Regions:
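Active-site-proximal loop/hinge segments that shape catalytic or ion-binding/gating pockets
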Residues: 1-166
């Protein structure tokens, strides 16, 4: 099944990115940028979602050139970052799925920068991620909850459909 049909079949109309509200003004100005573009353009980030280890792992796998996203608005990494006090004022950015068609995009059935993780082209979404389980409120310990989507380089602010607190 092609990506458009997969999204329609599973009722996926938005995808998600969590961050701290302190980053919103920068996102409004520049869009949602990959770690690599943030560094290249020397853009100040008030609060990174990832720590130095996460950034090093991203760079090692070439994932620093991608914006990391979730299919559901309930990702375990957001919970951990809030619990550890890294993100103090969490927000979820609701993003139009059209970004998956406009830029190079991929999917992974776990955290993309995990040592055992392999990312696949977005066209393989249904084969890679158990969408039935993920979209039916899986238990917090279900590994599928760590699934990620990645979109190359930048997501324009115009593709952000909404900002949700929490």
């Amino acid at each position: 099944m092609n990506l458009k049909n997969t999204l329609k079949q599973y009722g996926i109309t938005s995808i998600w990115h969590f961050t701290d509200a302190s980053n919103l003004a920068s996102i409004e100005k520049y869009g949602l940028l990959s770690l690599d573009l943030l560094a290249q353009q020397k853009i100040h980030v008030s609060c990174y979602g990832g720590d130095e280890l996460s950034h090093r792992l991203d760079r090692g796998k070439g994932l620093d050139k991608f914006v990391h996203l979730a299919i559901i608005r309930d990702h375990p990494m957001q919970y951990i970052k809030v619990k550890n006090g890294i993100i103090k004022n969490p927000i979820w950015l609701e993003i139009d799925t059209s970004v998956l068609f406009e830029n190079e995009s991929g999917c992974c059935n776990q955290l993309a920068n995990a040592s055992s993780a392999k990312c696949y082209k977005i066209e393989h979404l249904e084969e890679v991620i158990d969408l039935n389980t993920l979209l039916n409120k899986p238990h917090w310990s279900e590994p599928v909850r760590k699934s990620q989507l990645i979109v190359a380089n930048k997501i324009d602010y115009s593709k952000i459909l909404g900002v949700h607190h929490g």
